[in-house]
Amino acid sequence: MTAAVTSQVSGKRYMFKPNSSEFTNFTADFTNDEGCFTFTLHGRPCSIHFGFGKLVCGQFPVYDQRYAASGVWVSENTLYVRAHVIDAFVGSVHFEVVFGDADVTVFMRKQEESLFGEFQGHLVGMVCGCL
């Protein structure tokens, strides 16, 4: 894990540019062996928890499907997270999050036939100066 990057970005709130998926904001929080993406989608607060070197289970937001997720830093400022959907529907949602000095880019790809359409594409956000 890149401790320097996690301490710089953990807890920062990013506001997304208007997008068709209706994501409005994004925050990443980290502990030693876990992380959490918190975001607003369709006006609802949502979270995806994941582990580093382990799977963390939860309920996938919007669709209420069980998932198991883990993440890995693939470079100094790029985090890759895969959430395996393990419920009535089976598939996965992939996140590649690139943290800049004052911005974030979130690339998302779903591997499931009928759901999770919001989690396909990319989002660009800027650090929010509002608190």
Predicted feature locations:
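Peripheral terminal and inter-domain segments
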Residues: 1-131
